[in-house]
Amino acid sequence: MTTLSTIWLFLITITAIFQLGLSSNVTTIIDDDNNNNNNNNNNADDFLEPQIETIKVIGNKFFECESGHQFFIKGIAYQKTRQEGEIYDTTKEPHYIDPLANPFTCLRDLDYLKELGINLVRVYQIHPNANHDVCMNAFAEAGIYVLADLSEPTISIRRDYPHWDTEIFNRYQQVIDSMSNYKNLLGFFAGNEVTNCQSNIDASPFVRAAIRDCKKYINQQGYRKIPIGYASNDDANIRKNLANYFVCQLDEDEDKGQEHLNSQADFFAINVYEWCGYSTYTTSGYRDLTTMFKDYSVPVFFSEFGCNIITPRPFTEVEAIYGSTMKKVWSGGIAYEYFEEVNHYGILLTKKDGSITKLPDFDTLKMRFHAATPIGITMDEATICEPPICSNSVIDDKSSSSSSSSSFWDVALTLPPTPNEAKCECLWQSLSCVVSEDATFDEEVALRELCFKVDCEDINANGRSGKYGRYSDCNPTVRTSYALNKYYEQCGKKQEICDFQGRGELLPNRNGGLQDLENKFSSDGQNCLSLLEGKEEEKEVQEEEPDVPGLPGSNKGKEVESTPKRKGKGKSKEKEKGKLIEEEEEEEEEEEENNKTPSSGEKSPKTSKSIAGGNAITFKNDSIWKTFIEILFTCSAAILI
């Protein structure tokens, strides 16, 4: 009896241990599943896209895409500038400050921006290689949109020496690539006060060309339709002319027949400082502006406002801008500005330790913005206004008193061509005497000097006559090198001529001229000889890599890619898209296979891993357990017998 009791006790103990182990493992599996689910939920929250509606243009109004409500801009200029003598790492940072690339400052400022009651910030300088995810997503969560300028101080269309070239276009493309995926990006400015008086109205065709080519680029990259417009100064002599010019329809716009590919501005903005102190709708000139734009075909708003002749500023113009009369014409405005600078327009002061102090203007502007609650029309009520055909009489608009001083709009209705980097790469390869890589000088000054000595028709661009040289779209270094090489050849290829007072150099293995280009190609595979002769024939891709030296940039120390277009993150070249899609589909199938519920007779990979990793006694399968029990019972029976 004692032996039998011992055997049965042994069997019960083994069974209990097994059940305890199985129970422990089941508990472990459940805990692991719960932890994994929690982790998955946390990861989903981390990558959850901010719920903010994109803004679109219909007629002369902005609208929220999903709700269909009219959108009024209540914004502030958000741009910090470097102080004189400021020390920073030039190898890692540009010479300007991108306020959306610094999470510390933008998250610090976010509470103040929300308190202010704004729904948009204007950023004048974007660093295209920086990551903007933290700031842009945080702003989106707070319901704040962004209007970004495409230019930066050293790469922009100059009013005194305008060109639309490869360097500027590359810059614009990079900014578009870096910002286009954010839903709270309202749009881009292609220029800011490029034309600011009658003497430089010939710079405006270059801005329209920029609008045209950026729209085309956005379409080619498959981005959503992002509005692109222009910010003008408030010169009473030309503001109506400029407004008419940027929205009228050119012949080339009619040929395209597609709104998203034309050169017309999607919106027009004005930097207005007419309302000072406790002015009025009439005395400030706001009434005249509103009358001027009452039938305008695209949205119009104040890209800057906030006269500071009287301080602290009462910002009484805010009530008028969003009032019953002006809201029918204007889509709001952007107060100038957030950061206190040397010009004393700021509403907050940044201290050296990074802390913020409110200035008196902050609370006043906050009060005005919170009191402004305009209600506009719905998307269904929007009216599409057909823009007029461009002509000097239409642009002059003699019915406007502000343009009476202008005899005529003496600017050609022909725009500069789209910059062709492949052509400029090939031109560079044809030159033997070029601007020295180590030289530091103003390209414009050098060109003025050289063009007194040689004919520069091929690199000149004239917005008044509408004549654009075949190489006028190349960057300043290539244009200057072209003129220097021409002078060098004209003077018998004397080395001292190429030296150009220490600013030029001879490149080895360059004979110069077109005869050297038959076996050279641009970075996109075009034959250089055909390209420069105007044939622009495509060359089949050869097994050997084409000889493509990098295209120089006009800013020394700045890396300039030789490819005609620079892709942004998240976007692949057309030839890579198919491969990427296949890889993504394979990854999705593999993920589904791993996460699917196991069918009868199968074991979940996750369950197997959890059991194997437990501390309790485990068995690989049920057959081993059954065999073990049978052996125990057999031994028990033998002992009893």
UniProtKB/Swiss-Prot annotation:
Keywords: Cell membrane, Cell wall biogenesis/degradation, Disulfide bond, Glycoprotein, GPI-anchor, Lipoprotein, Membrane, Signal, Transferase
GO molecular function terms attached to this record: 1,3-beta-glucanosyltransferase activity
InterPro entries reported in the protein's UniProt record: Glucanosyltransferase (IPR004886), Glycoside_hydrolase_SF (IPR017853), X8 (IPR012946)
Signal peptide: 1-23
Pro-peptide region(s): 623-641
Classification via SUPFAM superfamilies: (Trans)glycosidases
Name the UniProt record assigns to this protein: 1,3-beta-glucanosyltransferase PGA5
EC numbers for this chain: 2.4.1.-
Glycosylation sites: 25, 621
Residues binding (1,3-beta-D-glucosyl)n 1: 124, 192, 336
Function comment: Splits internally a 1,3-beta-glucan molecule and transfers the newly generated reducing end (the donor) to the non-reducing end of another 1,3-beta-glucan molecule (the acceptor) forming a 1,3-beta linkage, resulting in the elongation of 1,3-beta-glucan chains in the cell wall. Involved in spore wall assembly.
Main subcellular localisation: membrane
Membrane-topology descriptor: Lipid-anchor; GPI-anchor
Cellular localisation: Cell membrane
GO biological-process terms attached to the record: ascospore wall assembly; fungal-type cell wall (1->3)-beta-D-glucan biosynthetic process; fungal-type cell wall organization
Bridged cysteine pairs (disulfide): 106-135, 248-390, 276-307, 424-474, 426-528, 433-498, 451-456
Lipidated residues (GPI-anchor amidated aspartate): 622
